[in-house]
Structure formats: C-alpha cells, structure tokens
Amino acid sequence: MTIQDLKKSENFFLLAGPCVIEGEDMAMRIAERVVKMTDKLDIPYVFKGSYRKANRSRLDSFTGIGDEKALKVLKKVRDTFGVPVVTDIHGPEEAEMAAEYVDVLQIPAFLCRQTDLLVAAAKTGKIVNIKKGQFLSPGAMRFAADKVVEAGNSQVMLTERGTTFGYQDLLVDYRGIPEMQTFGHPVVLDVTHSLQQPNQTSGVTGGMPALIETVAKAGVAVGVDGLFMETHEDPTVAKSDGANMLKLDLLEDLLVRLVRI
C-alpha cells in the first residue's frame, strides 16, 4: 500500500480503531463495522490498533495481550477485511518485527525526534506516520519527516495531536495543518488524542469526548488530508484511553456529517 491509495477519494481518509488490541473478537467486530460504514461513504480506511501501549501513567496500567498475539490480530483484520492496518512502534528493534504484520508504522508523539526510530521505520519501506510532539511547533516536524525521506522512504504522513497548554490540557492550533502540508506530505488530525487531559493526579488520563465532533469538523474545514479517531464499543470499560474515545455507535453518523463539509 502507498499513500496514493489513501488519497484515491475526494473525501478525507480515516485511521480508526481501538486504542490497544484488547482481544481478537472485539477487534474483528470493530473492524467489520467501520469497514462497512467507510465503504458506504467512500472514505479510504486504515484499521488502527496498538499492539502494545508502552506509554502509560502507572506501572499497573494495561499494556497489551502480548506482542505476537496482538500483531497476529492486526494481520487477521487485514487479511479478513482487505484493509490496511496501522500500529505504533516504540524502539528501532520493533520496526522490522511490526512491519511483517502491518502497512503503516506510527511513531508516537513523545518519540517523534528519535532519529534511530525514524530511520528504522523508514528502512522497512512501510508508510511512516509521525505524530507531532505536544512540545513541538508544526515547523519543527519538517525535520522529522526529512529524516525518514533521507533514509530512503518518501512515504510519510504527519499527524497533529494537540499542543501542551498548561499542565493538564492540550489545544489544536489549526494553522499548523496547512503549514505542515507545505512539506509535501499528507497531514492527519488525531481528533481523540487532541482532547486528552493528561497528567491527572489519579494517574489516569482524562478527556473531553463531547468535543470530538467540533474538533473533527474544524479539521475537515481547514482541509486536513486524514482523520485519526480511536473508537470502542464501550469506552467506559476500555483498557486504555477510554476517557477520550468515541463510542462506536456514534461513528457512522459523525462521518456522514463530516463528508458533507
């Protein structure tokens, strides 16, 4: 798969799925439903699921069902529904392993400056989606993208996921979307993570899911190339990031409203 495949529709493309792979059955149910709604709306779709969550607030937080088991779930989604899949990697040693199962390697925001990680992802030949660090300006992301390109891989996407605003909040500066697009790579808006409220004293990240539609509409209106949204059948029992995920039952109606913009 190439980035050109994601740009085949006049609509934005969508990266969506659970924050982390919690089990095969749930992942397959979510994928099946999102595939049906995106096919109907002519939205190019990439199934999203982290095979492991390396960045959790507390040691006792859920991190995954096991690397190989979760990666095999992602491969089953791809093989069953014929859609590409994306997952995060956290160190250079993970790039080649994950690339055997997925189509897009995602670089977490906190790791977006890690040269060895970016180069390792680039060398797999997969699409590399680099999330903008909450601490970086949009302009600084040019250098992260250049690392991947200079390592021999032009298949790069950049994702806006909010900028730190005080100790426990994030804001999206929509000016950054067209600015990053000038670098020559598609730009994605991570709607749900942009609504996180991190660093809570409870050790569990908060969120403002009621604003998902507002943030998504603004991104589409600005002209973002793709949207990233984590979704779950019941966010209240999700094992990671439930506080800012979109309930799956609400996704199709939201997409209908977004494609009208």
What residue ranges belong to the model's regions?
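Glycine-rich, proline-tolerant flexible connector loops at the mouths of alpha/beta enzymes
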Residues: 15-27, 45-67, 231-241
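Glycine-rich phosphate-binding active-site loops on the catalytic face of alpha/beta enzymes
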Residues: 20, 109-111, 212-215, 222-244
